[in-house]
């Protein structure tokens, strides 16, 4: 009888185990439904152009239930561009939000806030410069004109009918007629001899460098008197 009782107990255990497996396979408990897995599936969703995901818990703590949710409008906010998000006032809170609102009121450029609000101190401002004398005249007032503008004259060779003249600058180092004739000889290069006498258009002899006229025409000879008028250049006579 003892063996029979043991067999019955083992058979009852077998039936109980079979019923449990059948219940598990055919269980329709709400814990096994897919609706309860939505909160978990939120972690695996891919949001298109959403910068703040909607997986943030909507339930706040009891002490913050009376306050309006700050991210209520942001969760479903879609921004096509980074600059739209940066220029959206809903993303700013606290001190940054007040600064942003001041920008909108003053119609300032949103991208150059730091440049429009630079404090200018008195040490940064340049003081106006008061000139004692007009610029460029101080050296003349102290030392005078060091080098005057050189005179320009036109030189003609004697007995050259078709001579058009040579442009010549009477520089400051030429102090007398001798040095003037020496410089003229290097330019004209006469075939007869070096230049020794200089005549003006009135055929008067030039004896001093200061007698030269700016823009005047002069005839250079090697010590001979001026040639007849028919042998002189028309450019010199006119």
Swiss-Prot record:
The doublecortin is involved in the binding to microtubules; however, it is not sufficient by itself and requires the partial p25alpha domain. Human microRNA candidate miR-197 and to a lesser extent miR150 causes the down-regulation of apicortin and thus may be a possible candidate for nucleotide-based antimalarial treatment. GO terms for biological process: intracellular signal transduction. Residues 151-232 form the Doublecortin domain. Its main location: cytoplasm. Involved in the stabilization of microtubules. Probably by controlling microtubules stabilization, plays a role in invasion, microneme secretion and parasite growth in host erythrocytes. It comes from Plasmodium falciparum (isolate 3D7). CDD domains: DCX. One of its GO terms (cellular component) is cytoskeleton. This is Doublecortin domain-containing protein. Tamoxifen used to treat breast cancer blocks the interaction between DCX/apicortin and, alpha-tubulin 1 and beta-tubulin resulting in microtubule destabilization. It is found in: Cytoplasm; Cytoplasm, Cytoskeleton. InterPro entries: Doublecortin_dom, Doublecortin_dom_sf, Mss4-like_sf. Keywords: Cytoplasm, Cytoskeleton. The gene is DCX. Interacts with alpha-tubulin 1 and beta-tubulin; the interaction stabilizes microtubule assembly. The keyword DNA-binding does not apply. Pfam families: DCX. Residues 82-112 are annotated as: Partial p25alpha domain.
């Amino acid at each position: 009888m003892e063996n029979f009782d043991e067999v019955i107990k083992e058979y009852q255990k077998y039936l109980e185990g079979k019923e449990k497996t059948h219940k598990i396979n055919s269980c329709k408990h709400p814990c096994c439904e897919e609706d309860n897995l939505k909160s978990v599936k939120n972690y695996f969703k891919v949001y298109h152009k959403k910068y703040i995901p909607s997986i943030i818990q909507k339930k706040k703590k009891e002490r913050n239930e009376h306050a309006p949710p700050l991210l209520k409008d942001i969760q479903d906010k879609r921004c096509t561009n980074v600059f739209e998000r940066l220029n959206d006032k809903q993303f700013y809170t606290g001190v940054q939000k007040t600064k942003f609102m001041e920008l909108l009121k003053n119609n300032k450029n949103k991208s150059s806030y730091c440049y429009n609000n630079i404090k200018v101190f008195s040490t940064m401002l340049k003081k106006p410069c008061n000139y004692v004398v007009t610029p460029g005249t101080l050296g003349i007032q102290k030392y005078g004109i060091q080098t005057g503008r050189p005179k320009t004259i036109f030189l003609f060779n004697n007995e050259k009918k078709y001579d058009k003249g040579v442009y010549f600058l009477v520089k400051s180092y030429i102090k007398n007629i001798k040095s003037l004739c020496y410089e003229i000889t290097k330019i004209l290069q006469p075939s007869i001899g070096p230049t020794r006498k200089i005549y003006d258009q009135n055929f008067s002899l030039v004896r001093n460098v200061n007698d030269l006229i700016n823009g005047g025409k002069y005839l250079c000879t090697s010590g001979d008197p001026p040639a007849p008028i028919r042998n002189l250049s028309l450019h010199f006579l006119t």
